[in-house]
Amino acid sequence: MPNGTLIWHSGSTCNVCFEDDSRNGALLWVDGQTGDHGILASGVRNSFDGVWVDSMGYLFTDNGRDWEGNHPPEEVNLLVPGADYGWPNDEPDDPVPSGTIGPIAKWAPHTSMNGIDVRPENSSLPGLSISTGHTVYASVYGSWNTLLPQGHEIVRIDFTPAFDEAGNFSGWDSDETRIATQLGTPLPLRFSPSGDLYYATFGGGGTLNRFVQI
């Protein structure tokens, strides 16, 4: 975080359950100097990565429960300190239970959206200008319990500000686009200071790759 606070993404111990330790299935804040820590957000089943986006805040991925068909979608969420993001109470007929916060972007269920990073202005890869919105890129590891294989890709997500009828800011609209497919099992993903995008894969002994637009 800009103030130096570390964020620890703590996964759940189960597919669907109420955790005995509330630090599981949550985002934790950590003081890097003292080691003090606490719960920053709950209801987050399995968040792999997050990134700070100026004028938006902290975005983080979250992978929902398995073995429930086309539910729930993989998520990108905007951090609100103290908020509950729904797991394990989210259901197909009630995807955003009362008192919880829904995602600001979604992707195919059970595909494991993992790494995420904000596209810098100096990148040659496509994206919005800072005057119109923000673009992040995310890695999608790939499905393992769907009928047909999905994922194994890099996704571009554009966020643009939304306004109500009175012209007041009301949130963020998102637009998701596949940028590259058949990438194996991508996990971490980062833009370099020069604007190049790098990602690493898990399978096949692991590889580090630079993503280039042709």
For each feature predicted by the language model, list its residue ranges.
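Beta-propeller domain segments
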Residues: S12-F18, S22-I39, R45-T177, S194, ...
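Nucleotide donor/acceptor-binding cores
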Residues: G4, H134, G184
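Short coil/turn segments at the loop-to-beta-strand junctions that recur within blades
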Residues: V44-F48, Q182-P186
